[in-house]
Amino acid sequence: GYSKSIELGSVGDIRSVIRSQQWDLVINCVAIANHEQCESDPSSARLINQELPGMWADQAWQSGSRFVHFSTDAVFDGSSADRYFEDDATGAPSVYGQTKRAGEEGVLSADPDAFVFRTNFFGWSHDSARGILDFFANGLESGASMTGFRDYVVSSLYVGHLFELMIEAL
């Protein structure tokens, strides 16, 4: 596979990666997804969640590559008693949701044919410490007391299934 360290926010570095090969597909799944981190460091959230996706999409579009961007259901305000659809009004109350929505807009402005997957997914993290499955598995294994939410409704999708759906959509 391809691996290269780049300076986040550097259009030159992004361009270098995109133009290093003829990519059929460029997938952006980079994000600051920790809501608390976004609230405490909104400037980093704006760079990673809002500005970078459009930069990647623009460079992919210029090189003729298809572009996929992963967003979130947190772009909605959560006030609906029913499920949300793509064309429903957004109105995220959090920095995370606001920056992810702005990132979607940047992607679609740079490449109107880009795929934007607005989803909530789960899976195992590479270090077994950061995903929701890791949280519960590690907590159960250690006998730790865990608390959750009773008033939060979400329809999460396993990342393996999300990948299959993405391939099917392309």
For the regions a protein language model found, what residue spans apply to each?
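CheY-like receiver
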Residues: 17-21, 59, 106, 165, ...
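Catalytic helix-loop patch of NAD(P)-dependent Rossmann-fold dehydrogenases
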Residues: 40, 47, 51-52, 75-117, ...
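NAD(P)-dependent short-chain dehydrogenase/reductase
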Residues: 105-154, 159-168
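Catalytic phosphate/metal-binding cores of nucleic-acid and nucleotide-processing enzymes, i.e., regions
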Residues: 3, 46, 161
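NAD(P)H-binding glycine-rich loop region in Rossmannoid oxidoreductase-like domains
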Residues: 8-50
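A short beta-strand-loop structural module common to alpha/beta enzyme folds
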Residues: 1-7
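A short helix->loop->beta-strand "cap" motif at the edges of active sites that frequently abuts
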Residues: 62-66
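SDR active-site strand-loop-helix element
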Residues: 26-30, 67-73, 117-119
